[in-house]
Amino acid sequence: MISPLRSWILCVLLFFAAALCFLDRQVLSVLAPQIIAEFGMSNTSYSRVVTAFVLSYTLMLVFGGRVMDALGTRRGLALSVGFWSLASAAHAFVTGPLSLGLARFFLGAGEGPAIPGAIKGAVEWMDPKRRGIAVGLATSGASLGSMIAPPLVVWIALHLGWRGAFAATAALGAIWLMAWLLAFRGLPAAATTPAANRPTSSWRALLARSEVRRLLAARFCFDPVY
């Protein structure tokens, strides 16, 4: 079992993982005018770069839960953050639209499992009575990342250039990864693994519930705007 204190520490780390996820993806959006001008990109070329991220992110967002189930949240999130941080760092070395698109594709692939993993971790490691606030805390980091991205990225770019901005945000991911591994230090893997006999529900049973269908419809309408 995980102590209550360690459970909250892990939830705070999940919060920062979500924040970094939404911070890293917005670096390009903030710096796009400068990068487009430097590489002489057209609107069509830039749209392809954006699509590369959206495509891989969408695919891995769908299958991210499977990844977390297969690897476990402990290792799965470490792999996710480590992978997207490397992809973010790769942005600092791109030489044109093609390499930029590849970096965006791998960034999306790494970030896709992050939110499913954050929700899964909050549910697994928190007492049932506090799971609601734990999930809310873990996922609200996305709003923080979106909010601080523009001023932070502009400030870094003014001092280090646009390539330095990508490298700096990648470094934040490396710091998070070290903190994540330290948080599990001395904790047996079995302590973070939920019981195998936990009741499960089929997709058919879930979709048969009207509240689930309404929630899916609401998210379908809301998420593209968000």
Where do the protein language model's features map onto the residues?
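Juxtamembrane intracellular "pre-TM" segments in multi-pass secondary transporters
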Residues: 2-3, 188-216
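Membrane-interface helix termini in secondary transporters
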Residues: 34, 65-66, 155
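Helix-loop-helix hairpin linking two adjacent transmembrane segments in secondary transporters
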Residues: 138-182
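Conserved MFS/SLC helix-loop-helix module at the cytosolic interface between two early adjacent transmembrane helices
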Residues: 59-98
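Cytoplasmic helix-loop-helix junction between adjacent transmembrane helices
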Residues: 103-142
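Short hydrophobic/alpha-helical segments at membrane-entry points of transmembrane helices
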Residues: 98-104, 214-215
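Extracytoplasmic
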Residues: 9-43
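Residue-level signature of mid-helix packing/kink "hotspots" within the transmembrane helices
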Residues: 26, 54-62, 146-147
